[in-house]
């Protein structure tokens, strides 16, 4: 069968590559994809991820069996709704269900209603009221833009000055446009963070192996929040009991609650969690595969990925089985200056020297007229390596990262140290 993946990042590269491993998959198309995907026999389609008419047209012409929509923007713009209305099977939540990611305020109200553990919070549209609440609560405190901000709309403020600046940027300077006209201020939670993704179809929840993402730009979890600078899976210091508790107290009630709200969720429900002294709590929900978590979790899936998605789309029970042994580590190469201002068009060197047993997931790359790869985004690519232990994975992966050393790019040297 032929399949279509919508999106252009490292996550979509990982999804497409995994689909190609499936027995009865002939071609995987990616719209719009990126040039690096071609190296893994993924067919690129020059259609924007939100061009509903173009995508539907192509899916019909290419006789696509089903579509997977990767990023949050097309999900919230109703691309899945459009495919379904056109009679094309699409995996991902419809726009009204993707709101669990699209609005932090909606997610908070939803969690309160269904008794899903999360930090206490309040939502504001007026700067003076928000500032007064901030003064009352003190620091540390967390300030979030209500809408989508590419993973950068959250400030964990340890100093009052930082908190006030974040609030001003969001509400007065409109740093994230309409996304930050409404702001959620929530209590700071201390603990170990981890990501738990699940395949969801209505009330049915099939959890994946957990991962740990590294949100901050610099070593030692310092610097601004990013889309994610690296990840690994599984997370040895988070016990199976904790994961089971998160599935039973967070994912299942969320899936059930969405059905009750008439927002039937079929797709990937991602819970960004923190293990507190009171058990796991929700930091955020996303309505799709995490990036960079997907690049370390999907390679660990032993079941046939295309068959799994097809089963969910046909309301059948899928086989979901992950590797129990070993660990997969992924490190992001980013453009210097990311997540703030960065240059595009910088040449990547050393790509041809990477070991064959290291996976390369392209994200912000493209080929120039000479066929050389240059940067086209903040997060450029991710290298991933599976090994028996984290020490082995780090020892094998970081020399490969060094082959890409270049003043125009940077990466964190400490991804995975917590799991050694």
From Swiss-Prot:
Catalytic activity, EC: 6.3.4.13
Associated pathway: Purine metabolism; IMP biosynthesis via de novo pathway; N(1)-(5-phospho-D-ribosyl)glycinamide from 5-phospho-alpha-D-ribose 1-diphosphate: step 2/2
Any one GO molecular function term: ATP binding
Root EC class: ligase
One Pfam family in the UniProt entry: GARS_C
Name of this protein: Phosphoribosylamine--glycine ligase
Family the UniProt entry places it in: Belongs to the GARS family.
Record's keyword terms, sorted: ATP-binding, Ligase, Magnesium, Manganese, Metal-binding, Nucleotide-binding, Purine biosynthesis
Cofactor entry: Mg(2+); Mn(2+)
Gene Ontology biological process terms in this record: 'de novo' IMP biosynthetic process; purine nucleobase biosynthetic process
